[in-house]
């Protein structure tokens, strides 16, 4: 027997129901946002930070294509599109010094310490590494936000942007599922936002089990998991219903 769908706001508007795990979730696209996390050369392109640090980025191309599809559908349905770029200033002041755990745990910073010739090239604002991949181009009306840590809510105006627009539902895509995507969704959960991940529009940093573990955590404890085709179907005109 199917579980009932969830609806956070019954105050009216054009609503749609997205089939997801562990249950369907109902939302108003015009009061929702698609969050595109860190689709930069650093994370999705050979020669970028993840590749140079020893992570496999060979299967990111389908993810890029799926994000293109999801963004197009979301924009047509009136959803706000928010793009994140992870990184720091050219001097890495924003990355933190030895007194910051980020200094010790960031694989980008560790890679540059091991390979000094890369200093200033990884995740530095203005660098090729920091730029979004060529296939994904923000459009007028989209919002592009820099972030200095894994979570898109930390030291950014994201929560204020969402609350000022009455946005409670967030649909996540991007890289890496087990790091910045999950971190941002978790923080959103603590701030009373409903988070959905489109699993085929995300990619892990590390082995495949890291992707599976992150999705398990999300659907079991923090949010919902769906896919791009189901998301696009939910945003088709025939899927909308007015809820009084």
UniProtKB/Swiss-Prot annotation:
Keywords: Hydrolase. One of its GO terms (biological process) is uracil catabolic process. One of its GO terms (molecular function) is hydrolase activity, acting on carbon-nitrogen (but not peptide) bonds, in linear amides. Pfam families: Isochorismatase. Its EC number is 3.5.1.110. InterPro entries: Isochorismatase-like_dom (IPR000868), Isochorismatase-like_hydrls (IPR050272), Isochorismatase-like_sf (IPR036380), RutB (IPR019916). It catalyses: (Z)-3-ureidoacrylate + H2O + H(+) = (Z)-3-aminoacrylate + NH4(+) + CO2; (Z)-3-ureidoacrylate + H2O = (Z)-3-aminoacrylate + carbamate + H(+); (Z)-2-methylureidoacrylate + H2O + H(+) = (Z)-2-methylaminoacrylate + NH4(+) + CO2. The active site is at 38 (proton acceptor), 147, 180 (nucleophile). Disulfide bonds: none annotated. Gene3D superfamilies: Isochorismatase-like (3.40.50.850). Induction: Up-regulated by the nitrogen regulatory protein C (NtrC also called GlnG) and repressed by RutR. Belongs to the isochorismatase family. RutB subfamily. Hydrolyzes ureidoacrylate to form aminoacrylate and carbamate. The carbamate hydrolyzes spontaneously, thereby releasing one of the nitrogen atoms of the pyrimidine ring as ammonia and one of its carbon atoms as CO2. This is Ureidoacrylate amidohydrolase RutB. The lineage of its organism: Bacteria, Pseudomonadati, Pseudomonadota, Gammaproteobacteria, Enterobacterales. The gene is rutB.
